[in-house]
Structure formats: C-alpha cells, structure tokens
Amino acid sequence: MQEYTLRTEHATVVAIDQHARSVALAAVDLATGETRGTRLADCPTAARIAGWAESWATGPIRFVYESGPCGFQLCRDLRALGHACDMIAVSSIPRSADDRALKDDRRDARGLLEAVTSPTSRCRAVYVPSEEAEGARDAVRAYFDQVRATKALKMQTSGMPLGHGHVWNERTPAGKLRAAWTRDYVDWAGSVRLREGSPQGTLKACLEATVSAIDGCGELRKGLLELCLEPRWKPYVDALTRLKGVDDVVALSFAVTVDDFSRFPNGRSVSRYFGLTPGRRDSGERVGRNGRITKAGDTTVRRAVIEGLASLPSHTGARKRGRKGREVSAAVEAEAAKCNDRNRRRYRGLVDAGKKANVAKTAVASELVRQMWAIGLVVAREQAAGR
C-alpha cells in the first residue's frame, strides 16, 4: 500500500468502515482533492457500495477497509465487480489519542482514508486467502479454540473434588498413577459426594460439560484429519510431517494459513508473519539489543508449532519414519532430514550455552516455520510441474 501506487493507478480511493448491518464510506478524488462521505444501512451489498462510488467518481477506484470480524467476503465481492480492493491490517493503522477518545464510524472511515493516502503511509494489506483455504483455516482455529476451552473446563471440574478433600489416586499394578479424564476417572468424579451446603448438581453439570467438550475435540480433530487427505492439502501435509515435531494437525494448520507459499519473499518474512522474530528496544546509547518475540500475526500456528516441539529434547539423529501411502519426493526427504539434524543441533547448542529450554525451543520454532515454508515451496513447484 504505497502512495505512489495509489496515485498512478487509481483516481479515487474509498475507505470503508464496515459493520454487520451498515457501512460508513469516506472517499477522495486524488486528482482534485474532493472528498465525499456517506453511510449505508440495511446490510449494504458490495454492488451497492460500488454503485455509490461509481455514481460520482472518475477513473479506476480502489476500495480499502480494516481487517475485522466481517472477514474477506466484501473484498472478494468488490474484486469480482472489477474494482481493486484491499483489506488493511488494523494493527498497521496509526491511531491518535483523539481517535481513541472520539470514536464513530464516519471518523473511523476518514481516519483510514487519511492513513492509506498519506505519502508516508505504512499501512499493510492483508493477504486474502482462497475460500477453500479460509474454510480449512476456520476449522483449524475452531479445533484449537475447543482444545483451550476444554482444558479450562478440565481444570475447573477436577478442582471441585480436590477442594472437598477427594483425591484421584488410582494406580496401575506397576504403581503408576492412572491418567485422569478416562472413563474410570469420570465415574469416580461422579461418585464424589461434596460437603454439606455444596450443590451436588454443579459437579454433575460440570462433568457433563467437560465430557461433551472432550467429545467435541475428538470430532473436530477427526474432521481435520479428513481434511489432511484432501487433494488440495495432502501433498503439503505429507511433506511437512517429515519434519520432527510436526504432526498432521500442525502441518495442516501451517498449510491452510499460508495458502500460497510463493507470497513470502524469504524465510525471515515467514518468521515475522508468525511473530517469531525478536523485538527491538533501541534507545539512545542502548542499541543492538533484542527483546522477546513480537507475537504478531497468527497465534494459532505459532502456538501449535511451539507446542509441537515439546519432544525436541528427546530428538535423536535417527530419521523420522514415513508412513504407508504418505510418500514424498527425494528432494523433500533430503531437505527434511537436513532440517531435523539442524534443529536438534541448534537446540542442544543453545541449551549447552545456558539458554532456558523454552527459549531454545522458541528459537528453533522460528527456524522451523522457515523450513516448513521452504519445503512447501518445493511441493508447490512439484505440483505445478505435475509430479
């Protein structure tokens, strides 16, 4: 989103502050400087928005709007009508104190218009994925959201018997503590009698909600594993799972989020996209000091990749075994083996140098997403060549 591009390719820019049932529009004619604005209610369509601009604007029109819960559909619809349209990352739009204190739809639209047409604009356009990729990504995010919600339910529910003096201490014949949240555990928790004055029905309701959530996680995961076998994603999942610490769900999460592997110019841009590059805290004479990772971008993939590296301390130099029906090319196999060896040595070197285990894992995760991108590029080229 550069000012030069706007002025050389488009005569009019229209900023949209989008809501579910209404939009506020602010527009400027780049040749004359004339500005206009309006508000459209009753769930306006892309055709209605474009019609307002076309009724007075001259030359090519570029539409822009903030990223938000309304998603990519407006952008797709406006592009289908033949107009240029970008969704702008809301994190890249500058906000003044006045903008935060005095907020309304028309002011937001004017602020976005000023931001994207400024000669020093640093606004970034969001990548618009294919509808297939967006649907798969929504399924992935729903699964991880359900996993986190289920974890919270488990902690809440298992804490109720414990708080009343009941401890799960069933053990195997070998003396090992049996796992919680098995059928035996649920039966045991259901048989617990709380102290007088505590509603027994609360524990029962929490148990039912937790068991239902666990079942929901299983169903969602099953759906993701079926997606992994779809022709669109299977080559990428098969290739990415050759990397240690990357299972089917992590591989699918990465593939559906990236969608088009060629959109990244280099590996560092991939790490930056997933918030795995260190921040900077330079000021005055304090220069060259890196801070914590930025945690910008897609949280789901970043968390999945880091959690997938939990087994990193136990990685050996042995190759990861392939599965029947999940064969990959020799180029992918060789690249994955090289990456696995590098990650193992990188982790061990950082730990031996005194870095904390989680810091070392995060550093490896930053390299791992680059490696996944590089392998994805190989697969994309093979698919294009009709391997």
Task: Give the predicted meaning of each segment.
Residues 339-341, 345-387:
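Basic, amphipathic alpha-helical segments enriched in Lys/Arg and hydrophobic/aromatic residues
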Residues 113-141, 180-197:
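A short, charged helix-loop
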Residues 239-242, 248-353, 386:
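Phosphate-backbone recognition surface of nucleic-acid-processing proteins
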Residues 32-59:
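Nucleic-acid-processing active sites and adjacent nucleic-acid-binding tracks
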Residues 86-125, 175, 180, 287-296:
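Short alpha-helix plus adjacent loop in nuclease-associated cores
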Residues 7-29, 112:
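Gly/Thr-rich phosphate-binding beta-strand-loop-beta motif of the actin/hexokinase/Hsp70
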Residues 60-68:
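Short glycine-rich phosphate-binding loop at a beta-alpha junction
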Residues 141-239:
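Glycine-rich, often acidic, oxyanion-interacting loops/wings at catalytic, nucleic-acid
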